[in-house]
């Protein structure tokens, strides 16, 4: 009868499964806390000359949008559209950057 080698319950560099699960839960809790911190923040994107300002919550919900009356030109609605798009995209980019800075330390080895 062949016998399996006994590694003393160790694997993965000397860490047993119970220790690995404990470490994974700890990391998961830390990531959840980081995400909660991001969600609690507000992020603001501004167009050129601050004519349009878009404010988001950290969970990517548009909270407020302010449009300066100088941005409203009935003869050029495309300009206002471009300003809104610019402000919104900048606000969303801020959320992405904050998320990457905060959670990237946990995920960089996984990709």
UniProtKB/Swiss-Prot annotation:
A Pfam short name: YbaB_DNA_bd
Compartments (UniProt record): Cytoplasm, Nucleoid
Keywords associated with the record: Cytoplasm, DNA-binding
Record InterPro entries: YbaB-like_sf, YbaB/EbfC
NCBIfam families: DNA_YbaB_EbfC
Function: Binds to DNA and alters its conformation. May be involved in regulation of gene expression, nucleoid organization and DNA protection.
PANTHER family given in the database record: NUCLEOID-ASSOCIATED PROTEIN YBAB
This protein's name: Nucleoid-associated protein lhv_0401
Source organism (scientific name): Lactobacillus helveticus (strain DPC 4571)
Organism taxonomic ancestry: Bacteria, Bacillati, Bacillota, Bacilli, Lactobacillales
């Amino acid at each position: 009868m062949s016998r399996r080698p006994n590694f003393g319950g160790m694997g993965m560099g000397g860490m047993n499964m119970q220790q690995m699960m404990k470490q994974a839960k700890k990391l998961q809790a830390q990531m959840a806390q980081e995400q909660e911190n991001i969600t609690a923040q507000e992020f603001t994107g501004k167009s050129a000359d601050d004519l349009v300002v878009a404010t988001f919550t950290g969970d990517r919900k548009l909270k407020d949008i302010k449009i300066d009356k100088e941005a409203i030109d009935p003869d050029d609605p495309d300009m206002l559209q471009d300003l809104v798009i610019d402000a919104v995209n900048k606000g969303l980019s801020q959320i992405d950057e904050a998320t990457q800075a905060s959670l990237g330390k946990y995920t960089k080895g996984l990709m």
